[in-house]
Design a protein with these regions (language model features):
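Feature captures the catalytic cores and cofactor-binding loops of soluble hydro-lyases/lyases
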Residues: 3-18, 23-126
Length: 126
């Protein structure tokens, strides 16, 4: 893959390295009821990513929302081989942070996500 065009320093939530295509949402994501835990497809009606699959992508969104069970949906995605390669948030919150930790998904926050677009090549090192 080619080298990324931009470089940001964020706060590491779950250490690790990852590389992949960005899948960017301007809206928060709620994993319980918003993402199918077996397929990785965003199912929340009206969400900007509705119908898109998070598997293998660097998932970029402002913050999480919804039930604490959302952490386990991230774990379910990992167990099914359908997890995102990494997560980038503007500001993390406990639901997504715990999910990333238990699912071993590299995660950072405090990144200016408005500078990122779906399809960008992203590399995380943390």
């Amino acid at each position: 893959m080619r080298e990324p065009d931009l470089c940001f320093v964020g706060r590491v939530i779950k250490a690790g390295t990852a590389e992949g295509e960005a899948l960017v949402s301007s809206e928060p994501i709620g994993f319980l009821g918003g993402v199918d835990g077996e397929t990785g497809v965003v199912t929340e009606r009206g969400h900007p990513l509705e119908g898109r699959c998070v598997a293998g992508k660097v998932l970029v969104f402002p913050t999480g929302k919804g039930s604490t069970v959302g952490s386990y949906v991230l774990y379910q995605l990992a167990a099914a081989g359908r997890a995102p390669a990494a997560i980038v948030n503007a500001e993390s919150e406990p639901i997504v942070a715990v999910g990333a930790i238990i699912a071993e998904i590299p995660m950072v926050d405090r990144v200016p996500i408005e500078a990122l677009e779906t399809g960008d090549l992203l590399q995380l090192e943390g």
